[in-house]
């Protein structure tokens, strides 16, 4: 693992400009409102979380998978590859990169099938439609997009250091950790360094637990304006999440989501089993 975040591909290539991110998203916003797009982000983060828990993966593996998912759709439209295929593909790749051990082909497909059927049947009435050959091809596109920049830095380690420095580990760490987990339902991991996200989550935890940490934060040499920007995003997430009824809303939103268009049936375009073209679009 790269020892220095500031020299890593995460910082040099994958801290994005907010305006560029919104510009790339315009293709999808022709079909979805901003609020619907945001709900899709929450939903597919929940799918990845459920998949990871079903496979008994560590939270860091799940977080890495979520970042991969967000990176892909930061550069490509939702219609380029079906997110239902991309979600388990990201879990599969992250489990290898984070040295958790390769999730076997059979376990991955069984997990995706089970999770969609038991946890998300309100959104996906049909069976999980993909096989392992689809996942492997999707993994190729994902690796190509990320230019094999696979090391992801997360807020967990800096958060632990900050809480220990503050001397309030038992009081603040569990809540701040949960807030970090929730930030993966936003664009924050694409826009800010992990240490800033950790500080913002710690700040929110201090406010909730009524811990006066103003002096501690005042002594940091960090751009507090950026920390406040992150806090505003976190508070907005909780405000909107409160009114989001996944079970009632997701089927309609998914029906509006742009879908991959099968390319013309010409020679050489048929997939390994003759059917995967419906999950990819090169447009």
UniProtKB/Swiss-Prot annotation:
Residues covered by region (Disordered): 252-283
Localization per record: Nucleus
Protein name per UniProt: Cyclin-C
InterPro entries linked to this entry: Cyclin-like_dom, Cyclin-like_sf, Cyclin/Ssn8, Cyclin_C_2, Cyclin_N
Keyword terms of this UniProt record: Activator, Cyclin, Nucleus, Phosphoprotein, Repressor, Transcription, Transcription regulation
All residue ranges annotated as the Cyclin N-terminal domain in the record: 46-144
Domain of life of the native organism: Eukaryota
Stretches with biased composition (Polar residues): 272-283
Protein family (similarity comment): Belongs to the cyclin family. Cyclin C subfamily.
Subunit structure: Component of the Mediator complex, which is composed of MED1, MED4, MED6, MED7, MED8, MED9, MED10, MED11, MED12, MED13, MED13L, MED14, MED15, MED16, MED17, MED18, MED19, MED20, MED21, MED22, MED23, MED24, MED25, MED26, MED27, MED29, MED30, MED31, CCNC, CDK8 and CDC2L6/CDK11. The MED12, MED13, CCNC and CDK8 subunits form a distinct module termed the CDK8 module. Mediator containing the CDK8 module is less active than Mediator lacking this module in supporting transcriptional activation.
Annotated GO MF terms: cyclin-dependent protein serine/threonine kinase regulator activity; identical protein binding
One GO CC term, this protein: nucleus
Phosphoserine modified-residue sites: 275
Listed transmembrane segments: none
Keyword rRNA-binding assigned: no
Main subcellular location of this protein, as a coarse class: nucleus
Record function comment: Component of the Mediator complex, a coactivator involved in regulated gene transcription of nearly all RNA polymerase II-dependent genes. Mediator functions as a bridge to convey information from gene-specific regulatory proteins to the basal RNA polymerase II transcription machinery. Mediator is recruited to promoters by direct interactions with regulatory proteins and serves as a scaffold for the assembly of a functional preinitiation complex with RNA polymerase II and the general transcription factors.
GO BP annotation list: G0 to G1 transition; negative regulation of Notch signaling pathway; positive regulation of transcription by RNA polymerase II
Pfam (any one): Cyclin_N
CDD domains the record matches: CYCLIN_CCNC_rpt1, CYCLIN_CCNC_rpt2
């Amino acid at each position: 693992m790269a020892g220095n975040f500031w020299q890593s591909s995460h910082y040099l290539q994958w801290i994005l400009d907010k305006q560029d991110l919104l510009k790339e998203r315009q293709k999808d916003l022709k079909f979805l409102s901003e609020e619907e797009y945001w709900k899709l982000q929450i939903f597919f983060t929940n799918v990845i979380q459920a998949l990871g828990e079903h496979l008994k993966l560590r939270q860091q593996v799940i977080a890495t998978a979520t970042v991969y998912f967000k990176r892909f759709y930061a550069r490509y439209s939702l219609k380029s590859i079906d997110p239902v295929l991309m979600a388990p593909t990201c879990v599969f790749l992250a489990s290898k990169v984070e040295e958790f051990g390769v999730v076997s082909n059979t376990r991955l497909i069984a997990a995706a099938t089970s999770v969609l059927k038991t946890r998300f049947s309100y959104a996906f009435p049909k069976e999980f439609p993909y096989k392992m050959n689809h996942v492997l091809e999707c993994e190729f596109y994902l690796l190509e997009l990320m230019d094999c920049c696979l090391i992801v830095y997360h807020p967990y380690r800096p958060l632990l250091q900050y809480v220990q420095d503050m001397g309030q580990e038992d009081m603040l760490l569990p809540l701040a950790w949960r807030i970090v987990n929730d930030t993966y339902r936003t664009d924050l991991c694409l826009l800010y360094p992990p240490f800033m996200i950790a500080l913002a989550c710690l700040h929110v935890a201090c406010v909730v637990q009524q811990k006066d940490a103003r002096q501690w934060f005042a002594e940091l040499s960090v751009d507090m304006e950026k920390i406040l920007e992150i806090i505003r995003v976190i508070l907005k997430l909780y405000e909107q999440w409160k009114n989001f009824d996944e079970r009632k809303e997701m089927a309609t939103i998914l029906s509006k989501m742009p879908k991959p268009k099968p390319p013309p049936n010409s020679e050489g375009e048929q997939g390994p089993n003759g059917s995967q073209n419906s999950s990819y679009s090169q447009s």
